[in-house]
Amino acid sequence: MKALVWVAVGGALGAIVRYFFYKFVPQVYDFPLATFLVNVVASFLLGFIIGAFEAKPWGQQLKLALATGFCGALSTFSTFAADNYILLRSSKYITAFVYTAVSVGLGIVSVALGEDLAQRLLK
C-alpha cells in the first residue's frame, strides 16, 4: 500500500507539470509541441533516474515516486497517439511522420543522455 502512495504523489506532481506545459507552451503550426516536449523531458528524466539509481541505491519508494509516478504522469503516449491520429485525419501526413520519427528518436536519445549524465554526476 505504501508503494501506491509514493506512485500517487509522484503522479500528481508529474500531472501538474504536464498541465503547465500544455498551458504555457504554444502550438507551433500543426505540430503538437507541448506533447512532444513533455515526452522528451520525461524520457530524459527517466534515463537520469535509471542512471542515478544504478549509481546509488536510494530506495525503491523514491524510485517508484520518480520513475513510475512523476515520469509516468508527465509523459503521455495516449495524447501522442491522438495527436498523430488528428494529423493523419487532417491529411497532414508529413507532419505526422516527422512528429512520430522525431519523438521516438529523440525520446530514445534523451533516455541515454539522462542516464549518462546521472552516472557522470554521481560517480
From Swiss-Prot:
Q: What is the lineage of its organism?
A: Archaea, Thermoproteota, Thermoprotei, Desulfurococcales, Desulfurococcaceae
Keywords in alphabetical order: Cell inner membrane, Cell membrane, Ion channel, Ion transport, Membrane, Metal-binding, Sodium, Transmembrane, Transmembrane helix, Transport
Q: Which HAMAP family match?
A: FluC
GO biological process terms, alphabetically, are: cellular detoxification of fluoride
What is the protein's species of origin? Ignicoccus hospitalis (strain KIN4/I / DSM 18386 / JCM 14125)
Q: Which InterPro entries match?
A: FluC
Q: Which GO terms describe its cellular component?
A: plasma membrane
- Purpose: Fluoride-specific ion channel. Important for reducing fluoride concentration in the cell, thus reducing its toxicity.
Q: Catalytic activity, per the record? A: fluoride(in) = fluoride(out)
Single GO MF descriptor: metal ion binding
Main location group: membrane
Q: Which PANTHER family match?
A: FLUORIDE EXPORT PROTEIN 1-RELATED (PTHR28259:SF1)
Q: List ligand-binding residues for Na(+).
A: G72, S75
Q: So what family is this one in?
A: Belongs to the fluoride channel Fluc/FEX (TC 1.A.43) family.
What membrane topology term does the record carry? Answer: Multi-pass membrane protein
Compartmental location: Cell inner membrane
What protein name applies here?
Fluoride-specific ion channel FluC
Instruction: Name the residues that span the membrane.
Output: 5-25, 33-53, 62-82, 94-114
Q: How does its activity get regulated? A: Na(+) is not transported, but it plays an essential structural role and its presence is essential for fluoride channel function.
Keyword Membrane: yes or no? yes
Cell membrane keyword on record:
yes
